UniProtKB/Swiss-Prot annotation:
Post-translational modification: The N-terminus is blocked.
Family, similarity comment: Belongs to the FAD-dependent oxidoreductase family.
Gene Ontology molecular function: monodehydroascorbate reductase (NADH) activity
pH-linked activity: Optimum pH is 7-9.
InterPro entries to which the protein is assigned, alphabetical: FAD-oxidoreductase/Apoptosis (IPR050446), FAD/NAD-bd_sf (IPR036188), FAD/NAD-linked_Rdtase_dimer_sf (IPR016156), MDHAR3-like_C (IPR048618)
Record keywords, A-Z: FAD, Flavoprotein, NAD, Oxidoreductase, Redox-active center
Catalytic activity: 2 monodehydro-L-ascorbate radical + NADH + H(+) = 2 L-ascorbate + NAD(+)
Swiss-Prot/TrEMBL cofactor(s): FAD
Organism: Cucumis sativus
Role: Catalyzes the conversion of monodehydroascorbate to ascorbate, oxidizing NADH in the process.
Record-given protein name: Monodehydroascorbate reductase, fruit isozyme
Superkingdom of origin organism: Eukaryota
EC number per UniProt: 1.6.5.4
Record flagged with keyword Oxidoreductase: yes
């Protein structure tokens, strides 16, 4: 649901988003859609994300450091090391700071920003388009069980909004 407003302008220009590849070999001649239609194609652009092969960077030479998109950084908000691929982070990471992951993109006449992490149940707000990911960050218990107490400590993603009503 969240991608529909971004797919519509592309579809109007005969650009299709495919989420699965089957029976792939080395030569592209056509693309078969789930609805059975076949589209002739000479080239397919695949976006799969990026993760550097950092094992190639290992060295025993002193004072050699990784910088830029291949380097991890301690994100206090999530208590873990992560790669942060954003110019804002590159400008600020010379010193310790509390960074909120952020990126943005522009497609056709649409522009959007993403803040934080996409863990938990997706909740769409259609009036002013946006998506929020719901995660437990605290609990109020009246005579709670040990398992309910653990929820506050673990802070799991919410698998279903129905869970919040229980």
């Amino acid at each position: 649901e969240a991608v529909a407003p971004y797919e519509r302008p592309a579809l109007s220009k005969n650009i299709f988003y495919l989420r699965e590849i089957a029976d792939a070999d080395q030569l592209v001649e056509a693309i078969k859609l789930k609805d059975g239609r076949t589209l002739d194609a000479d080239i397919v652009v695949v976006g799969v994300g990026g993760r550097p092969l950092v094992s190639l960077f290992k060295t025993s030479i002193p004072d050699v450091y990784a910088v830029g998109d291949v380097a991890t950084y301690p994100l206090k908000l999530y208590n873990e090391l992560r790669r942060v691929e954003h110019v804002d982070h590159a400008r600020l990471s010379i010193e310790e700071y509390d960074y909120l992951p952020y990126f943005y993109s522009r497609t056709f006449n649409l522009a959007w920003q993403f803040y934080g992490d996409n863990v938990g149940e997706t909740v769409l707000f259609p009036d002013n388009f946006g998506t929020y990911w719901i995660k437990v960050v605290g609990v109020f218990l009246e005579g709670g069980t040990p398992d309910e107490y653990k929820v506050a400590r673990v802070q799991p993603p919410v698998e279903s909004l129905d869970q919040l009503a229980k």
